[in-house]
Amino acid sequence: MLTVDVVALTGGSVPNLLLVQRAHPPFAGEWALPGGFVDEGERVADAAARELAEETGLKLASLCLLGVYDTPGRDPRGWTVSITYLAPLPAEAPVIGGDDAREARWCPADTLPKLAFDHATIIGDALVRWAEGPDRGRSPPPQGDR
């Protein structure tokens, strides 16, 4: 299964991260990054933007590739690969839980709740990228026909 996750963050040395409370199993009621399954025929970056909008109401035109997470057992539903994006923002935007999310909220990176899946690992990687400097995760746009 192919999924996407989005690490949206804003702030200074201790950024705030956008999390959603899951409405459905697995991990119903637990906090996670916005994300979900890629639809057949859908571009991965488009799926990330769609899931972010569906679950939080936040619409972004630009996302930066963070990494690929494929550790066996990361999802109890079966073998799943997540292509993960970083979305550095200049300020917190209003968000609202929707679709598969009961709630969406900004949380300080130093006081995160228990997270579903391997999202603590993903967030750790995102925070390293965030701390790297002024470009904070900016990457060149993807190549290919669009």
Model segments located where?
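Polybasic "coupling" helices that flank or enter modular domains
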Residues: 133-146
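N-terminal strand-loop-strand
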Residues: 1-32, 45, 60
